């Protein structure tokens, strides 16, 4: 069966950063806060004129970080910061949060932590497992609505729409240990309800042109 790739491009917009108030789970607080502060200072020195260019530069700083899946799955749910292990999602979130922080002329790890929380959780609020934006499509929609990202897929002339229902997690409950908890399951199910027969913009790979993609764009392939 031919595989179809759904591609979303997002350009970073400026937002106001303030210090985080919620508890944070660091993998190693001294190492993490030092690495974040150092990276933010170095990123600020680059003086990039557009925030999305900062995403690219931040990504380059951590491109060699060892891959590790499941780093966010500890209980209870709280913002987790781990600069020594990243997966596809946490890599993008880290680069984006750093870009937003520096774009706002901040170089404090506390401001970075705040921006990371804003990106990772629905409405920027940590309220249990279900408040995390588990689906990349939901992540794009929620952050776009709050002005942290700008969805630009449908602005490209050869973009199309696919009607999809987000229900993979609750349809594969056994694959997600946290969903054994009935409250977590109900919360994720409630989030999925907002995406029943939802129209998602996408571009087929053969229709992508180099001129459509700018440095720092976030591209999600499914």
Sequence positions of predicted segments:
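Bacterial Sec-dependent N-terminal signal peptides
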Residues: 1-24
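Cysteine-nucleophile amide-bond enzymes
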Residues: 20-222
């Amino acid at each position: 069966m031919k595989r179809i790739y759904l591609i979303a491009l997002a350009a970073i917009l400026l937002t106001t950063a303030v210090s985080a108030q919620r508890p944070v789970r660091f993998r190693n607080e001294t190492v993490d806060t030092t690495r974040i502060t150092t990276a933010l200072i170095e990123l600020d020195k680059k003086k990039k004129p557009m925030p999305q260019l900062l995403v690219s530069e931040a990504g380059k700083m951590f491109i060699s970080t060892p891959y590790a899946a499941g780093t966010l799955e500890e209980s209870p749910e709280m913002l987790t910061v781990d600069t020594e292990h990243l997966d596809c999602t946490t890599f993008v979130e880290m680069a984006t949060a750093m870009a937003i922080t520096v774009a706002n002329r901040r170089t404090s790890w506390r401001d970075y932590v705040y921006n990371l929380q804003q990106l990772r959780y629905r409405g920027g609020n940590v309220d249990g497992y279900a408040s995390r934006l588990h689906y990349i499509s939901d992540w794009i929609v929620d952050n776009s609505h709050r002005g942290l990202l700008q969805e630009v897929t449908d602005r490209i002339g050869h973009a199309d729409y696919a009607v999809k229902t987000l229900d993979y997690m609750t349809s594969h409950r056994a694959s997600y240990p946290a969903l054994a908890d009935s409250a977590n399951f109900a919360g994720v199910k409630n989030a999925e309800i907002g995406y029943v027969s939802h129209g998602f913009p996408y571009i087929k790979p053969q229709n992508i042109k180099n001129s459509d993609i700018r440095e720092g764009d976030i591209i999600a392939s499914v």
